[in-house]
């Protein structure tokens, strides 16, 4: 997915642009205790999320990457909800945070729709916004995070 991903290295240098560095980055993600999830359409991976544990046991940083051909069709929402559900239920996370480009309107809409809110007082620049979501939100408490059973032509799985 990442070899054809656009825009390359557009936000915080991720995903890495050069192929050798991309391979190193993916290897680090798999071997450093990062929780990884992928979404595929039966032929190839079209999305990837990761939860990186923070200094506190019940917090993590989230990153999400959706191939440009699949943005706006629900795959990102399904993958995001599945990842958050796993973080809430299996990892017992109390807080999930991420950074997003302030100009990325599609991502901001998606994130806000699943409960992320801007972090007040964060050192945000015009192009970057820190957001967080309490994992003990009503969606997780009410068993509404049903993302692994979505009706899209995609499959979501933990890697």
Set out the residue ranges of the language-model regions.
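Conserved acetyl-CoA-binding loop-helix of GNAT-fold acetyltransferases
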Residues: 66, 72-87, 109-113
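A structural signal for short, well-ordered beta-strand segments
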Residues: 49, 62, 98, 127-129
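C-terminal "cap" of GNAT-fold acetyltransferases
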Residues: 121-159
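Acetyl-CoA-dependent GNAT
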Residues: 4, 12-61, 67
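Structured catalytic core of nucleotide-sugar glycosyltransferases
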Residues: 2-12, 17, 26, 83, ...
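Conserved acetyl-CoA-binding loop of GNAT-fold acetyltransferases
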Residues: 112-122
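Conserved GNAT acetyl-CoA-binding A-motif
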Residues: 87-100
């Amino acid at each position: 997915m990442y070899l054809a991903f656009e825009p390359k290295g557009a936000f915080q240098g991720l995903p890495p642009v050069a192929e050798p560095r991309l391979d190193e980055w993916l290897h680090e993600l798999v071997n450093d205790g990062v929780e990884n999830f992928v979404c595929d359409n039966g032929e190839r991976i079209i999305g990837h999320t990761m939860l990186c544990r923070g200094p506190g046991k019940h917090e993590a940083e989230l990153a999400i990457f959706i191939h440009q051909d699949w943005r706006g069709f629900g795959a990102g929402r399904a993958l995001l909800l599945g990842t958050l559900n796993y973080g809430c239920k299996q990892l017992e996370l109390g807080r999930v945070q991420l950074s997003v480009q302030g100009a990325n309107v599609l991502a901001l809409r998606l994130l806000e729709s699943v409960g992320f809110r801007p972090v007040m007082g964060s050192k945000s620049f015009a192009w970057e916004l820190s957001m967080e979501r309490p994992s003990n939100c009503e969606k997780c408490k009410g068993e509404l995070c049903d993302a692994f059973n979505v009706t899209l032509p995609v499959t979501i799985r933990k890697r």
